[in-house]
Regions:
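Metal-dependent enolase-superfamily TIM-barrel catalytic cores that perform enediolate-based chemistry
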Residues: 1-108
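Shared catalytic-loop signature of beta/alpha-barrel
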Residues: 79, 86, 95-212
Length: 212
């Protein structure tokens, strides 16, 4: 992880996102108990610490929890990672169904919070924004229904001075759609992509994307 992170930085990126809790892949008992073993937890801490040591203090490290954890586990993980490695956000700390649980998490964590890839309309995001449940939102241009709805979500977030970071899990077209939105809203933050998939992305395009 540390070596891969250094390569990302050397390629020109200023932010790295990862899920360090390998025990939860592929999703383990996510919707059953939401917990992680002490061994798996410590492995996650060690991975993020190694990445931080490798890339230094000027690179943002973002953590994606994939909604895998229950409330006390998410609070514990996010606070430890923020205190030890100064993470830039803890994303999807809980399954997305309960805004009340998200509020409880928000009140107990020190880390910045990012949510939104599994919220689908501006009305979903309105509740998050009105109740100060996140520092960043991550709408998905595919799952929100397209560029028009995502632009409306971005404009709504702008009223609350909340940055947006378009979620990307669908490939080259989604990256280009997210970039299109990012060029037209003032509260654009980062555009997600996976370095392992770049070759595959470019096979769908007439002109390759320069990701730096």
């Amino acid at each position: 992880y540390a070596k891969a992170a250094r390569k990302v930085v050397n390629d020109g990126h200023d932010t790295i996102k990862l899920d360090p809790f390998l025990e939860m892949i592929p999703y383990h008992t996510t919707y059953i108990d939401g917990r992680i073993s002490k061994k798996g937890e410590n492995q996650g801490y060690d991975i993020v610490s190694a990445v931080r040591e490798s890339v230094g203090d000027d690179i943002d490290i973002l953590i994606d929890a994939h909604g895998n954890f229950d409330l006390p586990t998410s609070v514990r993980l996010s606070n430890r990672l923020y205190e030890d490695s100064n993470i830039g956000w803890f994303e999807e700390p809980l399954p997305p169904e309960s805004f009340q649980a998200l509020e409880n998490f928000r009140n107990q964590t020190f880390s910045p919070v990012c949510v939104g890839e599994r919220l689908f309309t501006r009305w979903d995001f309105q509740h998050v924004l009105e109740n100060n449940l996140a520092d960043y939102i991550m709408p998905d241009v595919t799952w929100t229904g397209g560029i028009s709805e995502m632009r409306k979500i971005a404009n709504l977030a702008e009223l609350y001075y909340i940055p947006i970071s378009p979620h990307n899990a669908q490939g080259a077209g989604q990256i280009l759609a997210g970039a299109h939105i990012g060029m037209h809203v003032p509260n654009f933050y980062k555009l997600e992509h996976c370095i392992a998939f770049i070759t595959g992305y470019n096979e769908f395009l007439k002109e390759p994307i320069n990701f730096v």
